[in-house]
């Protein structure tokens, strides 16, 4: 894994958005388009947006698209620890963290203070588990969805 990027000081509010795919990912779909559109429409004079997701073949590890800085590290599994390391190295410069729930989670209640967490539910995935995974992972995923959603009930905000 590449070294941890240190953010430069910036007077703007800094929002770190965590997602398992970004707008350029090979399997990007509606969630990624929606997320990019929301983030790109922020007032970038007041808000610095950093989107963190896994690196994929042909992707730049660091690029800016429509005012959103895209950082890519790790893979579908290691991106969580990469995001955690990035947050820890920059926590004093990050004001809010958006954990996007779209099949994949970043488990921010374990490493981001409650007052900084924003939980964004793009879609619930109970019915997707049988399509995307095989037994026993599919059964485990379906049964853990509701208890795992409860982890975020005390976040600063929950967006659906």
Placement of each model-derived feature along the sequence:
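Hydrophobic anchor at the start of a short beta-strand
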Residues: 47-50, 117, 157
């Amino acid at each position: 894994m590449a070294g941890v990027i240190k953010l430069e000081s910036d007077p703007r509010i800094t929002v770190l958005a965590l997602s398992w795919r970004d707008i350029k990912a090979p399997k990007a779909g509606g969630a990624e388009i929606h997320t990019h559109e929301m983030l790109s429409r922020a007032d970038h004079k007041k808000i610095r947006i950093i989107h963190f997701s896994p690196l994929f073949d042909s992707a730049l590890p660091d690029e800016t698209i429509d005012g959103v800085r895209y950082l890519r590290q790790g893979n579908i599994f290691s991106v969580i620890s990469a995001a955690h390391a990035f947050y820890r190295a920059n926590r004093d410069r990050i004001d809010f963290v958006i954990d996007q729930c779209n099949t994949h989670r970043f488990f921010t209640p374990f490493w981001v203070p409650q007052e900084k967490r924003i939980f964004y539910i793009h879609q619930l995935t109970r019915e997707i588990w049988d399509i995307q995974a095989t037994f026993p992972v599919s059964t485990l995923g379906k049964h853990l969805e509701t208890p795992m959603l409860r982890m975020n009930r005390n976040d600063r905000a929950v967006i659906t």
